[in-house]
Amino acid sequence: WKMAEALASGDFSRYTVDSYDWMYYQTYPFQGPTALFMELFIRLFGNGALRAWSLFGSLSAGACLAALCCIAKELGAKPRTQVLCAVLCLLFVPIPMYAPFVYGTLPAPAMVLWGGYGVLRFVKGSKPSWLVLPLVLFPMAAVVYQSSLIFVIGACIAVLFNGYKGGWRGMVRAVVAAVLLLAVPLGVRSGLQSWFFARVPIPYSTGTPSTAHILMGIHSGTYYGPGGFDGSNWDLFWDSNADTTAANAAAVKGIGEYWNTYLHNPKEIKFFLQK
């Protein structure tokens, strides 16, 4: 949010070389497009931007509920079951807290769910025009919250599997749709990330690799793990001299160490199962 404010005002005084804020975008450059999205709210609503963002999050919670009902309906559920399904899916969301959360925790799932509804209508044989919905919403979701790409990849896999039902024509149709559904969000994110770095006094960075996030996900959270790795992808990146390639090599090595530990030390299985 602070970066969004800086983008809107043009004041980047806090982003001096080697400051925490400067290092943050070197480590996590994928947050740049998110800041650009939030900048829209600051430019549109000024001092009321954070309230507008909270309202956007609250409305997104309702959009999630509506999308889940529509998806359940398409899967053949009766009206009462649709509502029950949607409510059960939302029980884990503490809406009052997440509505103002500045990582797009509610807007992103609303976008991917409605995009998923469009994908569902498409694979059920409806008009190809239903693809417009995910082709618009999936890129927006990927910009608001990068992890939305996990859902996009899942949607692409679903489209490909469904393509087998239609013979070679259906498969070609499915492959084209899947490529578009993945390529457009990735292209939009990449373009916005380049634009972001063109606007800020921070050198372009490819940041911490995905493998570092995987390693962070399987570590024990202490120095207990192989090699004494404490699980911080931030530290892994900067210990590798802010080099994405070197950080990736270190992360791959760490993942291998954990895997070998699990294979050769049965006591580690307990930790693995807990994870």
Protein language model features and the residues they cover:
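Transmembrane-helix motifs of polytopic, lipid-linked glycan transferases
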Residues: 55-76, 114
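Membrane-interface alpha helices of multi-pass inner-membrane proteins
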Residues: 130-145, 177-185
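Membrane-proximal lumenal/periplasmic loop motifs of glycosylation machinery
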Residues: 11-35
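Multi-pass, polyprenyl lipid-linked donor-dependent membrane glycosyltransferases
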Residues: 53-60, 84-114, 119, 144-151
